[in-house]
C-alpha cells in the first residue's frame, strides 16, 4: 500500500510556511499549542454562530497567529470577509473580546486583522466547505465534485484532486470516490500544493473530504 504523507508538512520551509509564529521554552510549548487551538476554535465558533451564508460556509481559509511577549497578533484569511465586516468595528471588536475572554490574557495585547484572499475557490478549505454544504443538501456527490472543479478552474489553478470517503449517497458499504483534473504532482517538493481534509456529518453518517490543489511550481 502507498503511504501518503501530509502534503503541507512535507513542503514546510520550501513552498509552505507555518501558521503559528512564536518561540517558547520546551516546558511551556504545550501551553502555547493549547492556546493556539483555543484561539482558532473560538474564532471558528464565533463565525459559525454569527454568520450564515446561504450555503452555510464560513469562508475561513486559515488563521495565522504571531506571538510576542506583550502582543498576540491574529490574521484571519477569509474568502468572503464582507460577511464579518458588514458592521466592521463592532464585529471585530466583539470577536476580539471573545478571544480575550477565552484566553484570559490580561497582560498581553490582542490584535485581530482580517485579510481577503484573492481567489476564494482556489483554497481547499473553502472548497471543502462548499462540497460539504452540497452533500448536506443531498446533492449527488459527483455533481458536487464537478461543480467544485469548475469553481477552481475559474481560480486559475493548474490541477485539483477531490476525494470523498464514507457512506456515499447513503449506500450500505462505505467506499472511496475521487476525481482529478489537470496535474497534481504530490512527489515534487517544489510544486506548491494546497491540501485540506474536512469531515462532514450527513444524515447517513460521517463523510471525509480531501482536496489537493496544485497552485504553481516554484
Swiss-Prot record:
Keywords: Chloroplast, Plastid, Ribonucleoprotein, Ribosomal protein, RNA-binding, rRNA-binding. Gene3D superfamilies: 3.30.300.20, Ribosomal protein S3, C-terminal domain. GO terms for molecular function: rRNA binding; structural constituent of ribosome. One of its GO terms (biological process) is translation. Residues 47-118 form the KH type-2 domain. Coiled coil: none annotated. The keyword Metal-binding does not apply. InterPro entries: KH_dom-like_a/b (IPR015946), KH_dom_type_2 (IPR004044), KH_sf_prok-type (IPR009019), Ribosomal_S3_C_sf (IPR036419), Ribosomal_uS3_bac-typ (IPR005704), Ribosomal_uS3_C (IPR001351), Ribosomal_uS3_CS (IPR018280). It is found in: Plastid, Chloroplast. One of its GO terms (cellular component) is cytosolic small ribosomal subunit. Its main location: plastid. Part of the 30S ribosomal subunit. Belongs to the universal ribosomal protein uS3 family. This is Small ribosomal subunit protein uS3c. The lineage of its organism: Eukaryota, Viridiplantae, Streptophyta, Embryophyta, Tracheophyta. The gene is rps3.
